[in-house]
């Protein structure tokens, strides 16, 4: 069946003294909102923290602030009987290398799990929704799916505890094909090394881009758009199995 959930953060706001970075808002009144959502039948919640990469950022302050917010959200969600989906997203915007993404993703996840522990979050009762370790979108030498899988699994083995039951990847602006191929490679490698977590997906654009383009708001395109969506969903589901 389908379990309903809700995104509860209020988006990114400029980080004080570092206005090119964002910190996620929405903690004020969250405890009361979560009780209302649970009463309405919600089963899970989601909170996204955004980490950008340039030569000079992310700062430790940005990583720490977003990790703290994610942990507060997760603790409050579990207190309300909801499963938190913890989403620290290292953006793929930029020209950075896959090695730079590895470094920033490792730093970010290390702080996230430190903060989750500080807030007594039960890792067995939450899901992690991270980025894959990728080259920057504007890098002319994009890493292959196999390299993405190797770097992603290597990074997570360092910092994601085995107690986390599942990792559900965000697509993060990858093309439909790229998101599918990378997920497939990650699951193949995960199976090979007997990774301790389920490796699945939580895609928005990675499932919808081609569908929305075909539909374009026109009723005569609905059937074709549905066919495209079904095809992409089948491919992504197969990729989740490796």
Describe each PLM feature range.
Residues 1-41:
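Active-site cofactor/substrate anionic-group-binding motifs, chiefly glycine-
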Residues 1-5, 34-42, 75-79, 118-123, ...:
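Acidic (Asp/Glu)-rich catalytic clusters
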Residues 15-18, 49-62, 90-96, 137:
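Glycine-rich, proline-tolerant flexible connector loops at the mouths of alpha/beta enzymes
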Residues 19-33, 58-73, 106-107:
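Glycine-rich anion/phosphate-binding loops
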Residues 39-48, 70:
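Hydrophobic alpha-helical segments and helix pairs
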Residues 44-49, 81-91, 121-131:
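Short beta-strand segments at enzyme active-site cores
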Residues 70, 83-84, 88-96, 104, ...:
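Conserved anion-binding
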Residues 96-242:
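Active-site capping/gating regions of soluble enzymes
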